[in-house]
Amino acid sequence: MAYTNKVAVAVGAAVVFLAVVMNPRWTEAQTYPKLDRLCVMMIPDILEECFTHDRLKPTEDCCNDLKNATMTQVDCLCDNFLESLSFSDLSRTFSAGVLKKCDVSHKYMCQAAKNRGEAKGGRNSTTTCDNSITNTSVGGKNKVATSMSAFGLVAILLFVMF
């Protein structure tokens, strides 16, 4: 076998490792929906009033506030609370029960808001409001897995060489 300089091989392997791990195409910033001031101030109070107390029947204030929010703050309510991961901490059956008892049909409300936004050339959300969490960042998970497998390959090559 030919003589190889172990320092040069180690430096080359380190450069390849850093190029694979630090590739900027694989890192994407997570985007969050933009919140307006009214949404930030109004919606959390409604959610706290309606969903943090384990009642058999929601209060009249809760239902009135929810109905008002579904008419004036549909985008905020759907995008940031009903369809977001922050809302997933609440029991799905409990939250659906509160919305049903308040006679708020959120499944159709969110879909109608999405359709209105697309008709105006606005929102391009691909989520639906069926009380399920839709993850649109699946590609990011695959890129992390690819990066980790590349790291493993480089580590194996280093161990084989030395």
UniProtKB/Swiss-Prot annotation:
Which pairs are disulfide-linked?
A: 39-78, 50-62, 63-102, 76-110
Instruction: State the lipidation positions (GPI-anchor amidated serine).
Output: 137
Which membrane topology term applies here? Lipid-anchor; GPI-anchor
Keywords for the protein's UniProt record, in alphabetical order: Cell membrane, Disulfide bond, Glycoprotein, GPI-anchor, Lipoprotein, Membrane, Signal
Q: Which residues are glycosylated?
A: 68, 124, 135
Prodomain residues? 138-162
One GO cellular component this record assigns the protein to is: plasma membrane
**Keyword Glycoprotein included in the entry's annotation:** yes
Tell me the function of this protein: Probable lipid transfer protein.
Family of the protein in this entry: Belongs to the plant LTP family.
Q: By what name is this protein known?
A: Non-specific lipid transfer protein GPI-anchored 27
Gene that this polypeptide is encoded by: LTPG27
